[in-house]
UniProtKB/Swiss-Prot annotation:
Ranges where the record places region Disordered: 1-41
Organism listed in the record: Homo sapiens (Human)
Protein name: Outer dense fiber protein 4
Chief localization: membrane
Tissue expression notes: Expressed in testis and sperm; especially localized to sperm tail (at protein level).
Topology class, membrane: Multi-pass membrane protein
Length: 257
């Protein structure tokens, strides 16, 4: 009987040991699972706060606090500035072409209505050739001492009164010389520069007229900027206690258990 009792006692003791050991393991596994649950909750809270902050920043970027009229004016001002810069660049390139061009006059289609001596005809050809070479070559062909006093008159007469000079030259020499394509490109350059000046003038005028006519819009715009800057801070302050409560709740549950 003792042997049977002893033989039966060992299995019972082993079972009891297993029963005593299993609750400890279950507690450990439960604690580990609870810890992972805490981490999962923290990760979800952090991801949710990050997604909310990113959505708010995108909304703030898309929804500008400026009034609609200010935004339209700003877009038109930017387009006018880009257009004026492009036109000025094109005009400068054409101006270089005109300055170094040698086609101010079309000498191949020149006609003489009177027979001149050889020396006079040669002089007419040389003067017409110099005039057809453009402003820079015409300036280089003369000595600087002769043009020091009348430099301004020379430039003005060459650029602005070129057809009048040609017409006087044709009347004096009784000859007809057609004007070349460089002269017309020069007028195109002048028109482009006038267009740039008009765009810049109206751009500046409309901008300041809008600011002077709507002074309250600037105040409301600045106040809206301040509210937009303050709102993310307030939202972050309100979000932080939520995350702290989410972290502290599991510890309170452990104490209650």
């Amino acid at each position: 009987m003792d042997a049977e009792y002893s033989g039966n006692e060992f299995p019972r003791s082993e079972g009891e040991r297993d029963q005593h050991q299993r609750p400890g393991k279950e507690r450990k596994s439960g604690e580990a699972g609870w810890g992972t649950g805490e981490l999962g909750q923290d990760g979800r809270l952090l991801s949710s706060t990050l997604s909310l902050s990113s959505n708010r920043s995108l909304g703030q970027r898309q929804n500008s606090p400026l009034p609609f009229q200010w935004r339209i004016t700003h877009s038109f001002r930017w387009m006018a500035q880009v257009l004026a810069s492009e036109l000025s660049l094109v005009a400068f390139i054409l101006l270089l072409v005109v300055a170094f061009s040698k086609k101010w006059l079309d000498l191949s289609r020149s006609l003489f209505y009177q027979r001149w001596p050889v020396d006079v005809s040669n002089r007419i050809h040389t003067s017409a050739h110099v005039m057809s070479m453009g402003l820079l070559h015409f300036y280089k062909s003369r000595s600087c001492s002769d043009l020091e006093n009348g430099k301004v008159t020379f430039i003005f007469s060459t650029l602005m009164l070129f057809p009048i000079n040609i017409w006087i030259f044709e009347l004096e020499r009784n000859v007809s010389i057609p004007i070349g394509w460089s002269y017309f490109i020069g007028w195109l350059v002048l028109i482009l520069y006038f267009t740039c000046a008009i765009l810049c003038y109206f751009n500046h005028k409309s901008f300041w007229s809008l600011i002077l006519s709507h002074p309250s819009g600037a105040v409301s715009c600045s106040s809206s900027f301040g509210s937009v800057e303050e709102s993310p801070r307030a939202q972050t302050i309100t979000d932080t206690p939520i995350t702290q409560e989410g972290v502290l709740d599991p510890e309170q549950k452990d104490t209650h258990v």
